[in-house]
Amino acid sequence: MEFNGDRIPYLRDTWRDANMICGILPINPSSSGLWPSPKLPDPQANIEFWNYMFPHVQIIFLIVTILWQFFHFFLRRLGMIRFTSHMLTGILLSKSFLKENTPARKFLSTEDYKETLFGLVGACSYMMFWFLMGVKMDLSLIRSTGRKAVAIGLSSVLLSITVCALIFFLILRDVGTKKGEPVMSFFEIIFIYLIQCLSSFPVIGNLLFELRLQNSELGRLAMSSAVISDFSTSILSAVLVFLKELKDDKSRLGSVFIGDVIVGNRPMKRAGTVVLFVCFAIYIFRPLMFFIIKRTPSGRPVKKFYIYAIIILVFGSAILADWCKQSIFIGPFILGLAVPHGPPLGSAILQKFESVVFGTFLPFFVATSAEEIDTSILQSWIDLKSIVILVSVSFIVKFALTTLPAFLYGMPAKDCIALSLIMSFKGIFEFGAYGYAYQRGTIRPVTFTVLSLYILLNSAVIPPLLKRIYDPSRMYAGYEKRNMLHMKPNSELRILSCIYKTDDIRPMINLLEATCPSRENPVATYVLHLMELVGQANPVLISHRLQTRKSENMSYNSENVVVSFEQFHNDFFGSVFVSTYTALSVPKMMHGDICMLALNNTTSLIILPFHQTWSADGSAIVSDSLMIRQLNKSVLDLSPCSVGIFVYRSSNGRRTIKETAANFSSYQVCMLFLGGKDDREALSLAKRMARDSRITITVVSLISSEQRANQATDWDRMLDLELLRDVKSNVLAGADIVFSEEVVNDANQTSQLLKSIANEYDLFIVGREKGRKSVFTEGLEEWSEFEELGIIGDLLTSQDLNCQASVLVIQQQQQMI
């Protein structure tokens, strides 16, 4: 390359010296572009733009993003998670595939800036990942952890490490030797065992999140066990690092005074610094976080100054951890734990940094770290054999010692195996730990390569295997019939009422009043307030009956729900039992909380608010949540009991039951009966409502001319007629039920009938009857907009009918074991 010295004034006089080597300073990190401007001369103009630092980094970012997205597009269909795609991207760009001195290797290599820019970005990504995972983690999970989780967590880690060490010293001592000389150091072996026996909470949480098992009973148990595992292993690893520093340090304890040890011994200084930092996080940093929360007005965002100040402390803690010879993530993770999870502070930090860290920088960190994987060095069978044996033994021991306590606590065999697979899963923490150890010289290059390939294999096999072994929907299926049709007379009706927003409270209470609660026919209402999980990793289910007075002040904005339903309980004292819960979860997993609570409390009916709400005059839709709609559909598919979707309309003078009683009128309810199990379930609820003197029930039975002329022959129709006979007998006995039979021969006549009665009632009750073919609805399914409401329910809520009444759509229990 020829340089023109006249373009650089301070090199003009020395440029012609043949013995002088000149460089261009300062180095320009950015190019002048593909088409540089002649008005802005660049002394490095002869260098290709991609050889500049910043364009090179941007190209690597782009290639990594394209590759891992490409891999994940196909691998997710096989049940694999994103981390596997990140690893494959890194291996594809590593020395194993891109050989030295090839054009592709020179173009895609990060070695030129490995110790500067790429290393800095990777380190920042990794420590920010751990800080955010610390913010997500709820330490109260440890206090509420049961004996089962403690036993599994300790057994899978501490007991596994102990057993592995005994096996090594008693049986496998000669495995890591070559001609009598040790191939692997003692600390290398212990480090491998320690990492292999660990179950990292962030890794387990990410696996469960991507497999949508976070809300399952197995997922909660796995996360609780992982928390116990994390803390026990963190303490153990810190002790091991301290002992290694003592060994490597030139100064010895000997027979010196304790004061000399503390002052003169570097490992002791560092250990003391770690203890002081933990005390700082607990007694200074965490109170400051609560001070920030106190200074933030309710409903207002946290000031950016506070967030950036916290991030500066996070970077400082990483530097301190590195000085103390600890992993750089230890400091940020401790500070993350000290940040109160959830809104306003925890959620504000996550909303600001989570997407860029998890979506961009973390894949880049994994891919660039995997660049060091080099399969060409796997030449020695002794090396391979020793590492493979250590990894295999640790996996088998950990798997067995996780399965054993779970089985002893009465878990099914399949669930025990699934839990052991979850606890044995390896991810970004283990890969980062091996990369850090490789850079520090704790493990050899061949060890790093073999362990990295094992992590890739582990992450590629366990998630698909889990999907085949464990079906979370199976646990919601009941062994008994849990519906209103098969309830014993005068038995307690158990209802799970779901609240998505405060606007759902009044309509839900009004509907519960219509179920006729009395001392002879009591109603048990389990109220579940569902809120989106923001600012923490583990889902939370709060029982407000079990809360202390202190925790009631932090009820995640559920005060209105609790107070309103307590008043409902007082209004019907002795007839209504109310138990209120708040569930914090990600939207895709909320159905797990609903189904599990219904299963545990043996409810007969789940009531879900419809995903759309209307204005007061009914002229416009004021909210339309696709998330709530998908949640309702998931509950319909997996529910352990009957389900009702409640479409509330308050317009056109529609009244509540109390308002009708005050005006000496009755609350008008219409039950449309077309036939089928869902209609029979809906009619059972209508019969119960008829016991309330404030409610008038009208049962409109649709019958075709063919059905009227011919006698019923199929079993389903015979069940319909039997239930209708019971309704007619109640009418003859003086019950407040109006029964009418309408002859309808096609869908057009059904539409005309509904249009004629649409505004005569306060509430319609219909069955969903998904997939049931009927002469009454033939052809209408093509025009149905919301299939979760069924054909009749969808028609009643459509704008064409202009119905101003509320609608309750019932689906009978579907899942049975």
Swiss-Prot record:
Chain ranges passing through the membrane: 54-74, 115-135, 152-172, 189-209, 223-243, 273-293, 304-324, 328-348, 387-407, 417-437, 446-466
Topology of this chain in the membrane: Multi-pass membrane protein
GO cellular component terms, semicolon-separated: membrane
Pfam families: CHX17_2nd, CHX17_C, Na_H_Exchanger
GO-annotated molecular function: antiporter activity
Gene3D superfamilies: 1.20.1530.20
Superkingdom field: Eukaryota
GO BP: potassium ion transport; proton transmembrane transport
Keywords: Antiport, Ion transport, Membrane, Potassium, Potassium transport, Transmembrane, Transmembrane helix, Transport
Record's subcellular location: Membrane
Protein family membership: Belongs to the monovalent cation:proton antiporter 2 (CPA2) transporter (TC 2.A.37) family. CHX (TC 2.A.37.4) subfamily.
Function of the protein: May operate as a cation/H(+) antiporter.
Protein known as: Cation/H(+) antiporter 4
Organism: Arabidopsis thaliana (Mouse-ear cress)
